[in-house]
Amino acid sequence: MPKISVIGAGNVGATLAQRLIEKDFADVVMLDVVEGIPQGKALDISQSANVLGFSHTITGSNDYAETAGSEIVVITAGIARKPGMTREELLAINQKIMTDVVSNCLKYSPEATLVVVSNPVDTMTYLAWKLSGLPRKRVVGLSGVLDGGRLATFVARELGVKPSAVTPCVMGEHGGSMVVMPRFTLVSGKPLSELVSAEKADELAKRAVNGGAEIVAFLKTGSAFYAPSASIAAMAEAIFTGSGKVMNCAAVLDGEYGLKNIVLGVPVKLGKGGLQEIITLPLDGTENARLLASAEVVKGQIAALSL
């Protein structure tokens, strides 16, 4: 049976595993280093099969051998930045975690496509690509699907349309330097830049950029996981089914947008084996400058890795 593995059984990983098994296109293995957590959560999710009608199995495990033969491996493992911790300290810890995860995943699933979720996601996707030695098409990261979903929500509320009527375009770093592209964000086929003022577009963009932080401010002791898990599940489904769907993802660039040897959020086509095509948009001078500025932020993070 086809298989997808999720590494990490925290809020994002477990909710993702639930969404994947409910889509019912593959068996799901949820792995975590903490004994009992993935097993208990998988058992709980499995007991909804009769109610929801899915037929594939979900398994929780602490053993990477259970992930063998996965077509897709989603990596959510990593720690969040704690008070007093420098970015360099966070990167060092998450680099060690990513090194262990990539090594073990590819040991049992050498043909898998890797989908990276761990933060800072652009840098961790770059690290996974370097560690794995895989072709760039087989390593992608979550970025613009989530950021675009946030943008679409705020645009839809502003214009009184359904979120599904919005085709968002968000590029660059998954973070503070993220670049919203109003000219390429469409609402029922019309550019957002033609529907709202530049000031309103900036306001909507800022809210999308701060979407995750806004949720953290409400929750106090946690961060977003419902929208992230839905975004990852959509990426996994596009890869698994070979749909060729256009999504904004963190991808390894090799000359696109004048950038090389870096991971950055750009529009891509996802299909069998991962990245089918990077779509190069005709950016104007201002848009290109903002994208390059965002790339500099990611370059700084990559430079802090021990490679």
From Swiss-Prot:
This chain belongs to which protein, by name? Malate dehydrogenase
Q: Which domain of life is it from?
A: Bacteria
UniProt organism field: Dehalococcoides mccartyi (strain ATCC BAA-2266 / KCTC 15142 / 195) (Dehalococcoides ethenogenes (strain 195))
Protein task:
Catalyzes the reversible oxidation of malate to oxaloacetate.
Q: Which GO terms describe its molecular function?
A: L-lactate dehydrogenase activity; L-malate dehydrogenase (NAD+) activity
Tell me which Pfam families the record gives. Ldh_1_C, Ldh_1_N
Q: What is its EC number?
A: 1.1.1.37
Q: What does the UniProt keyword field contain?
A: NAD, Oxidoreductase, Tricarboxylic acid cycle
Q: Which family does it belong to?
A: Belongs to the LDH/MDH superfamily. MDH type 3 family.
Which Gene3D superfamilies does UniProt cross-reference here? Lactate dehydrogenase/glycoside hydrolase, family 4, C-terminal (3.90.110.10), NAD(P)-binding Rossmann-like Domain (3.40.50.720)
> Taxonomically, what lineage is the organism?
Bacteria, Bacillati, Chloroflexota, Dehalococcoidia, Dehalococcoidales
EC main class here is: oxidoreductase
UniProt: substrate binding residues: R81, R87, N119, R150
Q: Which reaction does it catalyse?
A: (S)-malate + NAD(+) = oxaloacetate + NADH + H(+)
**Where's the active site on this chain?**
H174
Q: Where does NAD(+) bind?
A: G8, A9, G10, N11, V12, G13, D32, N94, V117, S118, N119
Q: Name one GO biological process term.
A: tricarboxylic acid cycle
